[in-house]
From Swiss-Prot, chain A:
Binding-site positions, GTP: 16-24, 35-41, 64-68, 122-125, 152-154
Keywords: Cell membrane, Endosome, GTP-binding, Lipoprotein, Membrane, Nucleotide-binding, Prenylation, Protein transport, Transport
Motif Effector region boundaries: 38-46
Function: Required for the fusion of plasma membranes and early endosomes.
Protein name per the record: Ras-related protein Rab-5A
Subcellular location: Cell membrane; Endosome membrane
């Protein structure tokens, strides 16, 4: 951390129907790779990545669904306190777009009041089989104050851009989460959790 | 859904979710279902509309003076987390702490002679506390120093006694501690619900006092922490852990039939016409009414207040009051937990006080009068009486492992002891509460990932 950048950390959640490419978007963004047959999310459902803007660094703490969207059993705790959400649908599936709209409504009803929501029409590489028109999704996003982009986790088209747009839109205020005075729960005996600070270079 | 699972877990209360998470991390194939459409069962935290509906039905709406429904996260089973206790160890063991935010509870009080006092727990506090009479100060200080120095495996610190045999009663007498002092040590520091501990070996009580002191030392204001948005976050966080390690979740699943196939040694569970099989079932007592027994009743009264309680420090946004049994001529203690918007459980300006006690008479709510007297004006009250239910058998014969219902204690130690005991019966091995190797592996991978990026 040798520059004077301010670092802001935000909780970002992914929402959307199963198999629309939520995990693939994150893995593309965080690790820069794509697997044709990404297994349903198991094991690692908590990733971090930073985005550098001009004078600030935004660190995203990204929560994946851990497969709990499959039977509609995502817990409210999941999106509690999230400052940003990416609601993903598959541009080849109208059902997944309908489901995305339901998630947006749920976030507007139950999410943090100032949550930044991005709508992502994923699988743009398969645009030949498109069922959801860009204009339709664009209009819905505009009417509801959402960021909107069509993305491809496979080709990486618009993936970084999406996260950068979210980073720009997030309010950079010192306390971004409710309840000051939170305490860290650290191991009692030999307190080495191996957490490292990092910043982009 | 035609599949075989190692374990099917029924009910998403805290105990079931912790066990589900632990088993998934161990690599077991887990299916976790709940007949309700929400997580938490009895350990859920409710918004005002849900709470109101539970008491008043759907017709009448909650009054607007209570504020926005969604600002409420009211626990049905009030408890605080001892910051060096078993639940914290379980949260660390599984790395579930990362899903939750905690804040320290501001104060810990004990009721004595009609008023409340801050609980003294160190030798210096013993000397200054108004709770401790002049004659008691020195003996209490000596006793606290003895407890602080006590080490289980170092006989030099045992004062020449065998504390695995000597009763607590005898130890108190040796230090010349009088009834009032004994009362607050046993109930406000060692956190016993009744006086049966006095005839037990002193070692356990000393360890409980040390747990209290260690917990207090961590964050200094009180020995307790509490999660933002209420205790209902805990089962959800452990459910997420289970899901991350492959557990399958289904809500709104009524269980129609459970059949034991003795021949194949499997259990068939049917929900909404579909049948799955498993080796073992883990569930809360409501899923097997014929395999459990009632062991008394617990009353919990949720009071919505318009300001801090007048009997305590007005600056405190959260606190606990223990009312030891003898102080109010009862056979078991009464607890008051007070929370506010500081922990995101109610709108700004409101306070939630929850009184809980084991029912001892035919008029349970009257029993709570001494606690109500401490609260000031109560805007709204929701009173629930629930059975305390235990499984009849330990589950090893029929492979059905049933949790006990949540008791009247003010903390999670007995909850976690039940979980650890169940885990041992289910898996045949002890639950070791260091960070789980599979969690460490994942942490390391995440760490390597970060380094690569740098």
């Amino acid at each position: 951390m040798n520059n004077n950048n301010k670092i802001f950390q935000f909780k970002l959640v992914l929402l959307g129907e199963a198999a629309v490419g939520k995990s693939s978007l994150v893995l593309r963004f965080v690790r820069g790779h794509f697997l044709d047959y990404q297994e349903s999310t198991i094991g690692a459902a908590f990733l971090a990545q930073t985005v550098c803007l001009n004078d600030t660094t935004v660190k995203f703490e990204i929560w994946d669904t851990a497969g709990q969207e499959r039977y509609h059993t995502l817990a409210p705790m999941y999106y509690r306190g999230a400052q940003a959400a990416i609601v993903v649908y598959d541009i080849r599936s109208e059902d997944s777009f309908e489901r995305a709209i339901k998630w947006v409504k749920e976030l507007q009803r139950q999410g943090s009041p100032n949550i930044v929501i991005a709508l992502a029409g994923n699988k743009l590489d398969l645009a030949a089989k498109r069922k959801v028109e860009t204009a339709e999704a664009q209009q819905y996003a505009e009417e509801n104050g959402l960021l909107f982009m069509e993305t491809s986790a496979k080709t990486s088209q618009n993936v970084n851009e999406l996260f950068v747009e979210i980073a720009k839109k997030l309010p950079k205020t010192p306390t971004t989460r409710p309840g000051s005075g939170r305490v860290a729960i650290a191991p009692i005996d030999n307190g080495n959790t191996g957490k490292k600070n990092k910043c982009c270079n | 859904m035609d599949e075989h699972y190692d374990v099917i877990v029924l009910g998403t209360g805290l105990k079931e979710c912790i066990i589900s998470g632990l088993l998934s991390v161990d690599g077991k194939k887990v299916l976790h279902m709940d007949r309700n459409g929400y997580y938490g069962g009895e350990s859920a935290s409710l918004n005002m509309n849900q709470l109101w509906e539970k008491s008043h039905g759907k017709e009448k709406k909650a009054p607007e003076t209570l504020g926005s429904s969604r600002d409420y996260n009211v626990d049905l089973i009030p408890k605080f987390i001892l910051s060096s206790g078993l639940l914290v160890k379980m949260l660390l063991h599984t790395d579930v702490t990362r899903y939750l935010d905690f804040k320290v509870v501001d104060g810990s009080y004990v009721y004595s002679s009609g008023k409340i006092n801050k609980v003294p727990s160190t030798d210096t506090e013993a000397l200054t506390s108004s709770l401790v009479g002049l004659l008691d100060k020195l003996p209490l200080r000596k006793f606290f120093i003895f407890v602080q120095n006590y080490e289980e495996n170092n006989p030099a610190t045992h004062d020449g006694l065998n504390l695995k045999i000597t009763t607590m009663d005898a130890l108190f007498k040796k230090y010349g501690l009088r009834e009032n002092i004994v009362d607050f040590i046993g109930h406000a520091l060692a956190l016993y619900l009744d006086d049966s501990y006095l005839q037990q070996p002193a070692h356990d009580t000393i360890m409980r006092m040390k747990l209290y002191a260690d917990s207090l030392a961590r964050y200094s204001k009180s020995p307790y922490i509490y999660p933002l948005y209420g205790l209902g976050e805990l089962p959800q966080a452990f459910a997420r852990l289970s899901a991350i390690y492959g557990g399958t979740y289904m809500l709104n699943k009524p269980i129609e039939n459970i059949v034991f196939d003795e021949e194949k040694k499997i259990i068939k569970v049917t929900s909404e016409g579909e049948t799955v099989t498993c080796d073992k079932i883990v569930c809360d007592p409501s899923y097997f009414p014929n395999k459990v027994q009632k062991k008394g009743k617990i009353i919990r009264s949720i009071c919505i207040l318009n300001g801090p309680i007048p009997s305590a420090d007005k600056k405190f946004e959260s606190l606990q009051i223990i009312i030891p049994q003898k102080q109010v001529k009862r056979q078991s203690d009464m607890y008051v937990g007070v929370m506010s918007s500081a922990h995101c459980v109610c709108p700004k300006g409101k306070y939630i006080a929850i009184v809980s006690a084991t029912v001892e008479t035919n008029e349970p709510e009257k029993e709570l009068a001494p606690a109500y007297a401490l609260l000031g004006p109560i805007q709204e009250k929701f009173v629930y009486i629930s059975d305390f239910i235990e499984p009849i058998a330990d589950g090893t014969a029929d492979n059905v492992f049933i949790s006990k219902s949540y008791d009247a204690t003010s903390h999670f130690e007995t909850t976690c002891e039940d979980v650890m005991d169940m885990y041992k019966r289910i898996t045949g091995k002890d639950l070791v509460l260091t960070v789980h190797p599979n969690i460490l592996k994942q942490q390391e991978e995440a760490g390597n990932q970060e380094q690569e990026e740098q």
